[in-house]
């Protein structure tokens, strides 16, 4: 549902942020 979708988006953002560091 909405929660899992938000979690997936947050995970993608976290991965991108880690790569940017």
From Swiss-Prot:
Disulfide bonds: none annotated. Its main location: secreted. It comes from the Eukaryota. The modification Leucine amide is found at residue 21. It is found in: Secreted. Belongs to the gastrin/cholecystokinin family. Magainin subfamily. This is Peptide PGLa-R2.
């Amino acid at each position: 549902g909405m929660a899992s979708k938000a979690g997936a988006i947050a995970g993608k953002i976290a991965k991108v942020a880690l790569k940017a560091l």
